Every structure is written in C-alpha cells, then in structure tokens.
C-alpha cells in the first residue's frame, strides 16, 4: 500500500519538475488521478464497514486496534485448516461407529435382496428406471464407506440417506404383498430404531460444527477488519501526502502569477458578505490552512486581507467566484422552476375557468328552451 505519489522524486520534492505551465498541469493531473484511486480504496473500506453494520470501526475495531484480537490472514487460514482436519477426524469416528449399525443390518436374514445392485436386465425389470431415479444397495454403500481416494462419504448423514434409499426403492417398486416389500419394511424399522439411539451423537457434532463455523466467521471478520484498519491508516497518510503535493504545485503556480491588487482584495472582502453560512465556513477553513494560529471557531472571527499570503488570496478569489457563480446558477434554476410551476398553475386555473364558463353556457341554453 505504501505507494509513492506518482512521479514523485524521492528526496527531491518538486525540484525535478519544470516550472513550465504545461509540466505543472501534467503533474496536477497525475496527482489528481492518484487521489481518485485513493478515493476508490476508501470507498471499499466504507462499503466493508457498511456491510457489517459498523461505522468508523466498532468494538471489533477497537479490540483490533489495541492488538488483542488481531488475527492475520495466514493464521486464519492455518486455523481453519486445522479446525477442518479435527472436524473431519471427528466425523470419521462417527462413521466408524455407524459401521456397527451397518453390519448389524446387512447381516440380518432379510438383507440378502439388498446386498448388490438390482439385476435389472437379468430379472427383466424393464420399467425399473422409470420408477427408481437413483438405485442403491448395500455393496455400493460399503464401497463408499471404505473409499480412500477422497470420493467416499464426508458426513454420516449421507450414509443414513443412502441406507433409507435402499429400503424406499424396494418399497416403491415392489407390491406391498411381495416378500421384498415386507423385508424392506422390516429392515427399515430396525434401522430407524438403531439410528434413533445414534442420532444424539450426530446432533452433538452438528452443534460443535455450528459453533466452530461461527468462530471461524468471526475470526475472518476480525482479520478483514484488521486489514481495512491498516488500509485506512495508510490511506490517511497518502491523502495527506497528496494534499502536500498539490499545495506545493499550487504555490509553484502562484509564484508565476501576478500579485493580488488592493482592489481585488477589497472585492474579495465584499464578496464574502454574499456567501452562504456553509461557504463562509469553507472560507475560514482555507484561511486556517495557511495560518495555524487562526481560530475559525472563535466567537468573533475577522479576516485581515492584508496579512494573508498570495496563495491564500488566490484560493479565496477562485473559491468566492465559484461559490457566487454556483449560487447564481441555483437561483436561476429555482426562478425557472417557479415560473414553470406558476405557468402550469395559470393553465390549470384557465382550464377550470373555461370549464365553468361552458357549464354556465349550457345551463343558460337549457333555461331558454
């Protein structure tokens, strides 16, 4: 983030730049483009705080600023990887425990029809895939449970779902009066009974995972905020640097300009009387920038034109001109809007008057008849 101001000559300030007007203009354009990029970065920071409902860094930011809860991005990633590894190990333990239920069900005397995939062609079940969307059997489940290549089950609930699918497929395809239907129903009941005793362990793991995910989200937020706090601090420094550069450039320009005349000073003073309260506050800010001892918030404030330096006078001259021009433009727009509104109102009144006249004429004609 510690980019230097574009075109800045380290240790040389503006000495490496020609005093030629075109060179100064080009330099100003470079700095202004750089300021635009800073504003874009600042907007990203503001959007971040807006998205988490915090303005100017809330309690999280305060703790982060104190250094007590700063968590680096790399550390967050390492902690997340460690947490995932521990969670995966816990889930593997659960799936191993579930293996006991699986063996008990598959060793039951009614399990044999479901041990292997249905031989659709051999049994002539031509409509099987029209009824069954996802075939499932115990051998497929066993292979998935024992897979070592990363393609196996990641969660015990996946095994539970496939176990149910075995029985549901059999009950959906076969008639209720068939032996296969009866065996599937009997095994499903036994399986659900055993699962009911096992389920609390799964629910406890879900609670642990939920808490871990909340903590991970909080740590990620802390890391991101720490990054944005650092960015904000650097942006502040760079913006000050940019202001200094622009101030130097302005002084270079002023050095090439003529001095403000006494008449111009008087006109500036008179123009100040026409400014709005907001613009007057900006004027006081301009004076305060050039004169640190000036107190813009004092009860009584006076501006002595004769003691102001040339750069400040030129800034005031241009500011006052722009402020008055904008005020005049705004006034003209309001007058135009008022005239348009007045014209519309007059048309409406005229329209109503004409309607009233026509109505009166109709009544007169009727009375004559």
Swiss-Prot record:
Is this entry keyworded Hydrolase? no
Q: What tissues harbor this protein? A: Abundantly expressed in flowers. Weakly expressed in roots, leaves and siliques; and undetectable in 5-day-old seedlings. In the basal rosette leaves of 21-day-old plants, it is more abundant in leaves 6 and 7, which possess narrow elliptical laminae, than in leaves 1-4, which have round laminae, suggesting a possible correlation between its expression and the formation of elliptical leaf laminae in mature leaves.
Source organism's superkingdom?
Eukaryota
Q: For the region Disordered, what residue ranges are annotated?
A: 329-369
Do you know which Pfam families this protein is assigned to? BET, Bromodomain
Positions with biased composition (Basic and acidic residues): 329-348
Report the subcellular localization: Nucleus
Q: Give an example GO biological process.
A: regulation of DNA-templated transcription
- Bipartite nuclear localization signal: where is this motif? 351-368
InterPro entries for the chain: Bromodomain, Bromodomain-like_sf, GTE1, NET_dom, NET_sf
Please give the GO cellular component terms listed in this UniProt entry: nucleus
Q: Does the keyword Transmembrane helix apply?
A: no
Keywords in alphabetical order: Activator, Bromodomain, Chromatin regulator, Coiled coil, Developmental protein, Nucleus, Transcription, Transcription regulation
Where do the NET domain residues begin and end? 250-331
> Under which name does UniProt file this protein?
Transcription factor GTE6
